[in-house]
Amino acid sequence: MDVNPTLLFLKVPAQNAISTTFPYTGDPPYSHGTGTGYTMDTVNRTHQYSERGRWTTNTETGALQLNPIDGPLPEDHEPSGYAQTDCVLEAMAFLEESHPGIFENSCIETMEVVQQTRVDKLTQGRQTYDWTLNRNQPAATALANTIEVFRSNGLTANESGRLIDFLKDVMESMNKEEMGITTHFQRKRRVRDNMTKKMVTQRTIGKRKQRLNKRSYLIRALTLNTMTKDAERGKLKRRAIATPGMQIRGFVYFVETLARSICEKLEQSGLPVGGNEKKAKLANVVRKMMTNSQDTELSFTITGDNTKWNENQNPRMFLAMITYMTRNQPEWFRNVLSIAPIMFSNKMARLGKGYMFESKSMKLRTQIPAEMLASIDLKYFNDSTRKKIEKIRPLLIEGTASLSPGMMMGMFNMLSTVLGVSILNLGQKRYTKTTYWWDGLQSSDDFALIVNAPNHEGIQAGVDRFYRTCKLLGINMSKKKSYINRTGTFEFTSFFYRYGFVANFSMELPSFGVSGINESADMSIGVTVIKNNMINNDLGPATAQMALQLFIKDYRYTYRCHRGDTQIQTRRSFEIKKLWEQTRSKAGLLVSDGGPNLYNIRNLHIPEVCLKWELMDEDYQGRLCNPLNPFVSHKEIESMNNAVMMPAHGPAKNMEYDAVATTHSWIPKRNRSILNTSQRGILEDEQMYQRCCNLFEKFFPSSSYRRPVGISSMVEAMVSRARIDARIDFESGRIKKEEFTEIMKICSTIEELRRQK
């Protein structure tokens, strides 16, 4: 039967059909090859927006730098980064006037955080530029390598375990005349395999010592590595994103802590909240503007878009903001917070892997690393690439490009939001001193502006004033991409507002389906996603029921676990049929063991094992959940696990789901091929960290786990904890005297070994 698609929408208000226009079904586009071109684009564009600034040379690194601050005021509508310091400071002062004590209180909160944060805060996050190896690594490994190098160079403040002390080492390291580092390298040799008698390539990993002089070390410490942003939907061109090294991260973290604390107190800020809380905040601002625009006033809303938000932001401006916000605070605190923007005004962008050349006729491929772009003959490149390289050449040093203006994506989301809100704050009548006034919402580079005025001319005047104020602060509202509507219909951070928020269901589409973690987690995540969408995204009961049936079907095909009485033949059907026949209570079998599905939309909150527990045969229960069964996962599973969901836009979300350890919660093994590469040493390090951390968590379960403040090593902390716990257990009769003595003996042995070491 042919369905005319327009019929589907006859009864649906147009705004509810917005979902169908989003590019969120199917696989998102990924980038291949190097990100060098995209990074050069970013660097060149950023300099172009600030081209009328002042050029200077950094005395330490010799890098050319462009400073657009207080540059000429723009005369056209082209994007520009000429922020005016006095305007930014004035905007901050007015923000404080409207929110008395906001900066003061946030500083006090932040100071507390600064003194308590442990250095392991930096292990969060995924890929990080590891300056010791000059490439990306998992955050924990990059931090470990940095600390190891610091210690071997006599920097030991970090041993206290406090982040602030690690940062003291970072500052100290920048004054050193040279830094010794250990780098990994690979040797390949051809050897004959004893078994197959074939020639194979054997790789061995070597470590070698290398000394970096002050200049080279500074360049690495100020380097942001760049990659291409993957899985970005609805865009034709890819773009580059940056990952900073460990020297910068800690400082950025403290600045963002202060900015987050300020954003929490600002009603126009869309960060750091999300989801329903964000919608409530938004709805409040809209309500305020609509109630205040009585019959005499018009109210219009701009769905705003800024041109190249972070390429026109400037770290020097952030420094001015921080200097103002912390003006009555202790010297040490002001210094700690001002280092991040200072490092960013001297940052270097690493150009990535370089270019790949291939000759079709000779079947040759060769890589031109980024370091060579400064000297290579340009005749090998096509026109557009040649122009890029010519433009960027004066800025190149050791394979990195000097990039003083601009911010790179996602580094100071909170702080730049504060800047945006400070303009929205200026819309109050007492500041505009005329008949129009404005308010709105800001979330990083996204904004919605609500303007009220007695007539259309007033609205136009208000928008113009807002636009010009933005220009003074280095923010460029795009006239092409922003549009205006009667208040009541707008879009902000992909939330569509039409007299209330419309569920944009398509955004959730990518998270439906089977995740591919393991049978147990997948079942749990699948039903939780459906449950969450019924709560938050207008997923109706009939559709949810259908989604559930489709999910179960998908799940059975993925894990080849069709019901035991089905005719479908798969690799597993023989085993599953056998189990089905010898099970008395067939309803008790899990879906992944060929059992029936007992889920419906009323019981989605119950883990499948619990749902069927009473229906299971006893011996099945014993096999499924017996900790002595070697196939029951050996990692203890807390009652809640976290899955990382990739929503259609925005950062990966953490989603909690119930987890019950059974024979189905297996963890797949790592791919063997990594064990033959230069990553192997790194992998072993990573596993060692993992083991230490897991052990530590056993001693300090989260319920009783207050971060140890004070200077003791992990081992000392665990030993003293073991002694306390053992004494309590012994006195309350939970353990016997022999066990107690044995524990005490082990503790003493450990301490003895530590002393000998």
Swiss-Prot record:
Subcellular location field: Host nucleus; Host cytoplasm
Species lineage: Viruses, Riboviria, Orthornavirae, Negarnaviricota, Polyploviricotina
Name of this protein: RNA-directed RNA polymerase catalytic subunit
GO biological process: DNA-templated transcription; symbiont-mediated suppression of host gene expression; symbiont-mediated suppression of host mRNA transcription via inhibition of RNA polymerase II activity; viral RNA genome replication; viral transcription
Sequence motif: Nuclear localization signal, positions: 187-195, 203-216
Native species: Influenza A virus (strain A/Henry/1936 H1N1)
GO CC aspect terms: host cell cytoplasm; host cell nucleus
UniProt KW keywords: Eukaryotic host gene expression shutoff by virus, Eukaryotic host transcription shutoff by virus, Host cytoplasm, Host gene expression shutoff by virus, Host nucleus, Host-virus interaction, Inhibition of host RNA polymerase II by virus, Nucleotide-binding, Nucleotidyltransferase, Phosphoprotein, RNA-directed RNA polymerase, Transferase, Viral RNA replication, Viral transcription
Processing after translation: Phosphorylated by host PRKCA.
EC number from the UniProt entry: 2.7.7.48
Promoter-binding site, as annotated region: 249-256
Record text on subunit structure and interactions: Influenza RNA polymerase is composed of three subunits: PB1, PB2 and PA. Interacts (via N-terminus) with PA (via C-terminus). Interacts (via C-terminus) with PB2 (via N-terminus); this interaction is essential for transcription initiation. Interacts (via C-terminus) with human PKP2 (via N-terminus); the interaction competitively inhibits the interaction between the RNA polymerase subunits PB1 and PB2.
Task performed by this protein: RNA-dependent RNA polymerase which is responsible for replication and transcription of virus RNA segments. The transcription of viral mRNAs occurs by a unique mechanism called cap-snatching. 5' methylated caps of cellular mRNAs are cleaved after 10-13 nucleotides by PA. In turn, these short capped RNAs are used as primers by PB1 for transcription of viral mRNAs. During virus replication, PB1 initiates RNA synthesis and copy vRNA into complementary RNA (cRNA) which in turn serves as a template for the production of more vRNAs.
Segments forming domain RdRp catalytic: 286-483
Database matches in PROSITE patterns: RDRP_SSRNA_NEG_SEG
Signal peptide residues on this chain, from the entry's feature table: none
Coiled-coil region list: none
Catalyzed reaction equations: RNA(n) + a ribonucleoside 5'-triphosphate = RNA(n+1) + diphosphate
Superkingdom of origin: Viruses
A Pfam family this chain is assigned to: Flu_PB1
Protein family according to the UniProt entry: Belongs to the influenza viruses polymerase PB1 family.
GO terms assigned for molecular function: nucleotide binding; RNA binding; RNA-directed RNA polymerase activity
InterPro entries: RNA-dir_pol_NSvirus, RNA_pol_PB1_influenza
